Amino acid sequence: MIIRVCIRCFIVLTLVLGIGGCNFFGINSGREPLPAVSPLTPPKLPDWIEQISPIGEAQPLNQIRIRFKEALIPVESLDSPEQQQLLQKFALWPPLPGQFRFLTPRMVGFQADKALPIATRLQVTLKAGLADLKNHRLDKDLSWTFNTQSINLTNLPGVNPIEKADAEPIDLQPKLQFTSNVELDLASVQEHLQLIPEGKNEGLRFQVTLNKEEKPLDKEEPLKKFDPSARNWIYNLRPQKNLKTATRYRLVFSPGIRPAYGNLVTDREFVSKLSTYSPLAFQKINFYGQPDAGGTYGRFIKGSPQLEFNNILVAESAKTNIKINPAPKDISRLLQVNDEDRIIGINPYALEPAKTYTITIGENLQDKFGQTLGKPVSLKYDTGDLAGDIWVPSDLNIFPAGKDLRLNISTVNLPESKYQAAYRVVKPTDLVYFNYGNDLLPKPAEWKSFQVSGKKNQSVDVTVPLREKINAKTGMLAYGVQARTNKYQENGKELWREPTTYGLVELTNLGVFSQWFPESGLIRVNHLTDGAPVKAAVIEIYQSKLQAKSRPEPVPCATGKTDENGTFRVNREALQQCTAGSQNSIKSPELLVIASEKEDWAFTRTEEYSGVYGYGIDAGWQGNKPESRGVIFSDRQLYQSGEKAWFTGFADYLQNGVIQQDKNADYQITLVNPDGQKTSLGTQTTNEFGTFSLEMPINKTQGLGYYTIQAKGKNGLEISGEFRVAEFKPPNFKVEVKLDKEFAYIGDDVDINATSNYLFGAPVEGGEAKYFITRQQANFIPKGWEEFTFGRQWFWPEEAPTISSDVLQSNSQLDGNDKSSQMVNVAKDLPYPMTYRVDVQVADVSNLSVANSQSFTALPSNRLIGLKSNFIADAGKAFPIEVIIADPTGKLITGQRVRLELQQIKYSSVTQLVEGSQTPKNQVEYKTVAQTEITSTSNPQSVNLTPPESGTYRIRVNFSDAKNELGATDSQIWVTGGNAVFWGTRDKDVLEVKLDKKEYKAGETATALIQSPYADAELYFAVIKDKPIYQQITKVQGSAPQIQFRVTPEMLPNAAVEAVLVRQGKPINQVEVGSLDNLVKIGFTPFKVNLEDKYLKLQVKPAQASLEPGAEETIQLEVKDNQGNPTKGQLTVMVVNEAVLQLSGYRPPNLVDTVYAEQPISTRFTDNRPDVILQPQDVAKPKGWGYGGGFSTGAANTRTRTDFQPLAYYNGSVLTDASGNAQITVKLPDDLTTWRVMAVATDGNLRFGNGDATFITTKPLLSNAILPQFVRPGDRILAGLSVTNNTGNTGNLSINGEISGAVKFNSKNPTTTTLQTQAESATQAYRFPMVADSVGVGKVRFTTQLNGTADAFELPLQVKPLEITEQIVETGVSQKQIKIPLNVDKNTFPEAGGLDIQLASTLIPEIKAPAKQVLTDNDLPFTEPSASQLIIATNLQTIAQKYGQTFAEFNSRQQANLAVEKLQKLQISDGGFAAFPGQEKSDPWVSAYSVESLVKASQVFPNLVDTGMLSRLKTYLQKVLANPGEYDFCKQQLCKRQLQLNALIALSELGDKRNTFLTDIYEQRNNFDLVTQIKLARYLSQFPEWQDESQQLVNKLQQNISETGRTAVVSLPPSWGWMSSPTTAQAQALRLFIAKQSKPEIIDKLLQSLLALRRDGTWQTDYNNAQALTALVEYGQLQPTPPNFVATVQLAGRKLGENRFTGYKNPSLQLSVPMNQLPRGRHDLTLQKSGNGTLHYLVAYNYRLQGNQPGRFNGLRITREISQVNAKRILRKTGIYALDQPLTLALGQVFDIGLEIIVDRPVDHLVIKDPLPAGLEAVDASFQTTTAALQAKADSWELGFRNIYSDRIIAYADHLEPGVYSLHYLVRSVTPGTFSWPGAEVHLQYAPEEFGRTAEMKLIVEEKGR
């Protein structure tokens, strides 16, 4: 009997395990080798089975799928026994984690928990007895096998044995590595791996290990967790014996290697060859950089020399062991030796041409293996001749007319001894349209030729006679120079390199400075020779039109003459003439200024960003458009649904530099919800103070998240504010933390004191305080010394010391005075400044917690060294450094002796032993090259140090008496020298302007110090904002002139000083060459103006500090200005519950900061003098999902009596009397709390102030509810109240409880309870057992009495239903009647769910967004975007014509015209298209792509496309087809074949359909990416002789498609390019299946999946939009005539609905039948169709589950795990099944809830819902009352959006690729009891039938020790 029972249990257990797919609890099982499977021949399918997949070789993400012609099951609930029995007829061997499920009634798929393992053969069996509803039946098993990719070993050490070259030599104890595509069985690798010496049969064995870095990590990428084949499996090999030197080996992996998890062993050898190192030897001298298309990098015709050795060298030893004789030129970096290299390069510029050198290699040259050369090697080297070259200055160069500078063309060894050149005199007006020489000159073929004669290897300078060419002493010349310099080979042809240089040279004596503001301009002209201002210079201003298409004769928009100071001012009217027609309010003007004096002229051009950066300010541009400086703020910013919110708007704005109030103006108010949807809130009118106020009720159904409230005025002004809707239960107590030190040092103790009080005044006596103390590195800078560097720095490759961030965690109880204390010691391991953060969390009797934090800075020393210097210096020049010594507060310390060292940084690589193998490691050395000592004073000390050569240096400063480095300070500088490092030219034109302060008060005098490099100069000095406020022109002398100016209110809130310094003095032709760098320096420095006069002082005085709930409070308000004078004004006053405010820390905004926010310095400027040449030149979330909250609509009332209100009073406009006084009276709600009165004042004159005060409401005896926020039916809770005794007396406390409604006491009397107990002096909790009886609302009332004082409250407690719904769908396409079986179980819950039926005549949706996107994205002049926009315009025109859709503001023909114009400009002479303007050769990829757009456009828009354009393109593509290898980037076969396929497809579009090269292309099919394979299949389908091959590709593609009830998604492997995006793959697959005339329902699913890839109605990019719309148009052509049919829906003979589909006006019908109207049992749903057209249908049956539910994985998989916060041990993990034993958690603790979601295919719009049990509350980390010390584990970033509700967590992902994803959040156990914990659920938002759910479980929350 016992045996029989055991056998029965075993059978049941086996059945359960089978249903679970070898996965009992829905949790991953361990990995083990899989049993072998013999291959089977693909079976012949019976007619009623349509398709099996996959067959042959499958990818890891392929779906196992079986499709049937007829339904196997009716549309019914997922848990019907018949379904489960049918699924037993599907088997997979070996069993993999997962289970079979019905995708639709006609399709079954395997839902895998992991990707299919690599190197595995699997067998799928459909068992005998499997039948459909039409009684087709299998009378025997039907099986087939498929296998995944075989084991592939790559990156083998050494080289391929068939290669002639040897591998890099290896060490005798090498650490070798190889890569596998799958995890391997290590024992089998060791068994089948040998290293065989050359000529031997036996070899060495290896120790094989998986590389540490490759072992799976906790935070692994989602795809790698799901599909291990996505990882690199790298293995380390270590020979078991030492190898022999100078020996060749073969590394052989023989057949038979097993995967760690799989069943297919390797069936072939993997071999490589390698060799050990030989004695170090010199091999040969090589040459690099010979003349080619890019010039002569190696300088000489034969190239630059390199010394090649057989082993890798130690770089430092090479530099000391190579000698060259005769000695080369002394230039830096004569030798170039890279780490891990065996080649030494010699700098060719150190060598002379046609000269023989002797190179001696010393015997001590060392290689990486520690060997030396042993004996010196000497070799001769002849440089040979210099390669031909030509050089001439490019771009614009200005030569001062009085200085004899020349334009030289420098040539050397030109092969033909000639060059070509062209010259043209430039007129001033030419510059309106042209900015470069190449625009002004004829084509190079028309240029004149000039002979050059000179000696070989000697540079010849040809001087261009400028004045002769210009025919004047001044003027401008455009020139172009070209010469043949060398021949080179390309594609078998010999070509000439012909470099072409264009330039402009100007002879002038005029320096021109032009500056523009929104309403004015300034032009200054000085002579270049001596800087004297030019009086009466003629000024002409033109609009700069470099992009103009037509070029009429230019006319100046403004003219004038300079005054005595050389200045011409442009007024507003003149400037408006110059900006007419441009967007003046948005963009700065683009202007050309011509200044002339007699025949001499010069120019400056102002472009959009001229002078914006690099001169001391980041200039803006405000224009004349008003800019908002106002705001909308609320009473408390944080709300719950069902509450009311108040808002006040301040409508201030900045226009033309003036701040104004928008009084008596109408504003349209709009609410923007978290999803971006907008709701109008009507119109508000501002009052005489420029403000308005409004009340807004927050609906009960309002979504959680962040909302924006916007107000738009008629003048375009917009102000806005933000608020948040959340669910929360605010704690009614607070915590304060105080530290006894702000700064601490090593060894110091810091005292922490924490205090906690209830908001109604009583102490939180006996509460638990938890201390969390952490630290992190801080970049500490004493206040006021922000420009200095402090403390040690660790420069690469050094790393800062790592020390633990955790300092201390401790618990303590609050004493009778509500206090707790803790001491922390600053540890001795402190290597750098650290911020110590102290978090204190207090929990009271209700188990709610509040946290607060403070921090202090721990420093290694109380003396801080500050260091300031530039980061770039010149070699050999003194480099200034400023030093200070300060204490942490910023006060300077004097008399401290410090040593400064300038240390050269030397980098090197050393070899260190890691795990027994040699690993290179970077290291750094510091060599002191200069040092000095100084003593600190009360001012910064300046010292100079000189770096001897270029390179990287460290400045190290430390105390002279220091015993360690703790107090040192470091900084890094870069030193430039004679090498090619070039740090930019603009810096030499920047003038340093220093102000004595950063902020001034109005009326103060500011001093500016000008750092002048000139002995004599003219200074233009100004203070500017959007215009010059102060201006001065003065002559200055010496290196540090000073300017003083008075700060005025007009400069509020900020301005900038500007200085333009023009060099004056003796003429420049009398100045020594090289002594003058430039003729002008320009600089700006911003400053702020103090705003204290803009503040009002506001006093708020409540009449009573403490009063009872429900009483009236009187509040006095008083307004004064900053000087204390009474001021009349307006007050916005609110009285808010502090419990809500402390969650967010909200206070109304500081309006002075808002209104007087920093204003842009609106200016642009240019100067022509930086281009002046002074000496000859040498050859040169959705926020929509928000986050937060955690409590229900009633939760706001959980701390209330009967009238809880978070807001007691709000008035947006309280007016004061003339003395600034006002009084309000507030009727208070019943809350026991602290009320905060907050007020914002304004006086109507742009002055503002804030004030607040608090008072409390309390009682002698008071009680507060201790209730959960909700309960579910069946929950048993311990809840009640807390009682605070403020009477000061003890006695008999009486508590009476009453409950009604859906909750009962769990006692003999279910409605009332009483308790008599002795009163305590502190706050005590009293809990009573209760039970949730039914869904609804229970009312809980408690009354307390003590010695004649009493308190009572009544609160609702909501009993929430658990709503678990499931959905089944059936979709399809029909030309006739169709019957769908439906089975509604008689026990189905009747009040929820039902049947939804959607019928449609087309699935093409309304398309508008791509049209809008083209309008915003049409500014790129490239071929691909232009071709994509042309395709979009063409397709939209087709859709518009067919479906009657209209696109506002989008004219298809006009947009097509614009795109064709762009493409015409990009077609070049060979007929192809350049990818971008200026590209010299056509791009074959974009040329082929553009064909489709042009052909489609010519069909839809007749005569739009020039036939010649298509003809030239056709000729070009024929050449590409014939010779794809002519492109340098396309030498590999794969690229050639892909290019040929693209050319064939394009030629076919052009009417030239060919089958040439198809055999070669088809051979590469397996190497093509998925999108190219789809294109190939579609192209092959056009040819009868290629049909089989096309179908094979389609069959393979079908395996890459994952199908569900309504979608078919192409699974795309990770790709490199945008041309293979998921949208492209989906669109191309849809086009292929249309071309192959596949089943209509498959085509519909592909279309639905393509539509699902849209975001905001668009596919994101022009390319994706073009691809998708092309597929949509081809889909639309499946129905050539508009539909005209009648569709009728019947169920069980009853007509549900009927619709006539005529044309595309109303293309869809939706019917819904509620569950209580559906007939029970089995019936047919009949869809009848009569007429012409196609009927698309979707039937969805959804129903609610009853009772406790097991989990279910129906398309998605989810598991839930619970652990203590910050702990690794998992307390419980739940999948499909839950343990019978309840989970018990301790009360008052914090736990981490982790959800793991597995997705086996790409999905869109995924929703995660995790219900909370009533005993737990989610922790909202965004609240300020939450401690940052407790952190949830890391989430997958793809699950970024979440909301916290009182009873659930909702998260969302927009798109997920296959993978394993995790979501974590924290909960706190607050209510003791026994609770239902429903399963976590994941589903697709728009396909809820695809879901996963964990099993429901029981939770017990109990106090510790119970």
Swiss-Prot record:
<feature type="lipid moiety-binding region" description="S-diacylglycerol cysteine">
    <location>
        <position position="22"/>
    </location>
</feature>
<comment type="similarity">
    <text>Belongs to the protease inhibitor I39 (alpha-2-macroglobulin) family. Bacterial alpha-2-macroglobulin subfamily.</text>
</comment>
<dbReference type="GO" id="GO:0004866">
    <property type="term" value="F:endopeptidase inhibitor activity"/>
</dbReference>
<dbReference type="InterPro" id="IPR041246">
    <property type="entry name" value="Bact_MG10"/>
</dbReference>
<keyword id="KW-0564">Palmitate</keyword>
<dbReference type="Pfam" id="PF00207">
    <property type="entry name" value="A2M"/>
</dbReference>
<feature type="lipid moiety-binding region" description="N-palmitoyl cysteine">
    <location>
        <position position="22"/>
    </location>
</feature>
<dbReference type="InterPro" id="IPR032812">
    <property type="entry name" value="SbsA_Ig"/>
</dbReference>
<dbReference type="Pfam" id="PF07703">
    <property type="entry name" value="A2M_BRD"/>
</dbReference>
<dbReference type="GO" id="GO:0005886">
    <property type="term" value="C:plasma membrane"/>
</dbReference>
<dbReference type="Pfam" id="PF01835">
    <property type="entry name" value="MG2"/>
</dbReference>
<dbReference type="Pfam" id="PF17973">
    <property type="entry name" value="bMG10"/>
</dbReference>
<dbReference type="InterPro" id="IPR051802">
    <property type="entry name" value="YfhM-like"/>
</dbReference>
<keyword id="KW-1003">Cell membrane</keyword>
<keyword id="KW-0449">Lipoprotein</keyword>
<dbReference type="InterPro" id="IPR001599">
    <property type="entry name" value="Macroglobln_a2"/>
</dbReference>
<keyword id="KW-0472">Membrane</keyword>
<protein>
    <recommendedName>
        <fullName>Alpha-2-macroglobulin homolog</fullName>
    </recommendedName>
</protein>
<dbReference type="InterPro" id="IPR011625">
    <property type="entry name" value="A2M_N_BRD"/>
</dbReference>
<dbReference type="InterPro" id="IPR002890">
    <property type="entry name" value="MG2"/>
</dbReference>
<keyword id="KW-0732">Signal</keyword>
<dbReference type="InterPro" id="IPR008930">
    <property type="entry name" value="Terpenoid_cyclase/PrenylTrfase"/>
</dbReference>
<dbReference type="Pfam" id="PF13205">
    <property type="entry name" value="Big_5"/>
</dbReference>
<feature type="signal peptide">
    <location>
        <begin position="1"/>
        <end position="21"/>
    </location>
</feature>
